[in-house]
Amino acid sequence: MRFNNIRYSVILILSCLLFSDSSAQELITNVYGRNVQSLNGKWDAIIDQYDQGRKNKIYLNKKPEGKTDFYEYSFDHGLLLNVPSDWNSQSPGLNRYEGKVWYARRFDAKKEAGKRLFLYFGAVSYRSRVYLNGKEIGKHEGGFTPFQIEVTNLVKDTDNFLAVEVNNTRTVDAIPAMAFDWWNYGGITRDVFLVSTPKVFIEDYFVQLDKRKSDQVDARVQLSEGSANVNIQIQIPELGVNQKLVTDNKGFAKVSFGVKKLQRWSPDSPKLYKVIIASKDDRVEEMIGFRNLYAKGEDIYLNDKPVFLKAISFHEEIPQRKGRAFSEADAVMLLSEAKALGCNMIRLAHYPQNEYTVRLAEKMGFMLWEEIPIWQGIDFENEATKQKAGTMIREMVMRDKNRCALSFWGVANETQPSEPRNKFLKYLIETCKAVDTTRLMTAAFDLVRFNKEKQLFVMDDPFIQELDVVAINKYMGWYHQWPLAPEKAKWEVAKGKPLIISEFGGEALYGQLGNDDVVSSWSEDYQASLYRDNLKMFKNIPNLRGTAPWILFDFRSPFRFHPTNQDGWNRKGLISDQGFRKKAWYLMRDYYNNIK
């Protein structure tokens, strides 16, 4: 993006393209507000377990023409897969499959003079190569962020053949890498659109309140081409705003303007305004909220008032069907359960989730923490891995920067201190801030230890100085024994900064009752007791400004081996995989309801 620190942004973009496995183009902001043709539905598929598809050029989709012609592949009359969705939940044989699957479909395209066409993928997990009418047109790496490819001069009016090679193989240089505590879903997991735009269109924009000023909106607009002296209008009809801008020779324009009687967005009152951005040839509108957010001392301020974050985490998974969440209905289910718990914030773990979830969360009044999957064992010394991470975080921020609910950008989870790690994460923060400086930067750490001499919980990690808000994952009573009574446990961590307990809890199999002091019982009673103890300890953390139990629902994980109590599921959920609330759920609901 060309808004903040243009020269630095260009350097970051070039370095990302040099090192990342991606040939996709700059993202169109607010694709859901554009003229789109859906390519969702049933796609033909071929499982390519031994990686022969590209070698055999199956993307050409050739058919026998003569008596001696034959091909050892065909997309016809074979496996059908739904898009969007993961492949794991659609076929028993693909449940644990890791490798390549080819997706294919035909479509017609309405080509119009003076219009451009883009293929847009909401997400493909994890690597993808895209072929149109027998030609490779782009590739992308990263399973949770969108990408697009211009196809204006490549599509035909009728009978276009689109093939996508999808590969979810884990590798040491990937993000996440070889081992991670969730299911490795593969497939075209989010919407696929053919997007139509004018020749010169409104490619990108950013409209938000100034970080500290409650009556000043900052707006920036970027056209798709460097067209000078183009008139741009920004309108907010409900506020009587009608701002006129003129682009420079790079097609860029910005303005700051005052607003009167603005109702700021908050969890209690998630007000959104219709915002219209228009040029002579293009017009985009969407609902945008306005709020102030900043950290000062040990507090987090929302609309100039301290806020306590009553949070929860969830994966992008519907446990009842053992598959990825991909629809607005899925988002409603997940967010409704978080609302019933009394939450005002969601940590979208551990990766950017579906845009349906982000937009609906904003409407329902949830603040959001969004992160990329820098999860534990990443190759921090690998330059290519670093650039991949930079591309991912940039794609995440570009997609969601106009969502006022987005409050925190997360750069890592449970990483070990080292100089390569520090440089890697600092690069991610710089990449993030080159696009957006209005959110709070955070990361989750798990190295809090008990200092016997001081009788305090402490943490030694120099990187916390780079963050606006420090987050701690600590599983007292589960992975860590209590060194003293919970009510006597005091903390001295990240002094002078706001602190969030970003993960705590333990596992319980729904309906399993037993001793509340025996960890190996895997019982709801022990899980509830563990929660009580942690809530007692939280009273002794002076800079605690939020809690986020791990996790809302039980979720699938190959990490979890116990045959009777886990069976491939992480059972830390407050709600079971069948949707039943455990005893600890009621404890957290009461805890949150008593915080005003």
Residue ranges: model-predicted function:
Residues 218, 333-336, 345-591:
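Substrate-binding/catalytic cleft of secreted carbohydrate-active enzymes
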Residues 29-34, 205-208, 264, 278-339, ...:
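N-terminal carbohydrate-binding accessory modules
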Residues 29-30, 46-50, 93-201, 226, ...:
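Accessory beta-strand-rich segments of carbohydrate-active enzymes
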Residues 1-27:
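Bacterial Sec-dependent N-terminal signal peptides
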Residues 199-226, 592, 596:
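Surface beta-strand/loop "capping" patches
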Residues 131-137, 237, 280-281, 303:
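Short strand-turn-strand beta-turns centered on an Asx-Gly dipeptide
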Residues 24-89, 161-165, 171, 532-535:
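Accessory carbohydrate-binding/adhesion or oligomerization-edge regions at the termini
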Residues 155-159, 222-296:
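Extended acidic/polar, glycine-enriched regions
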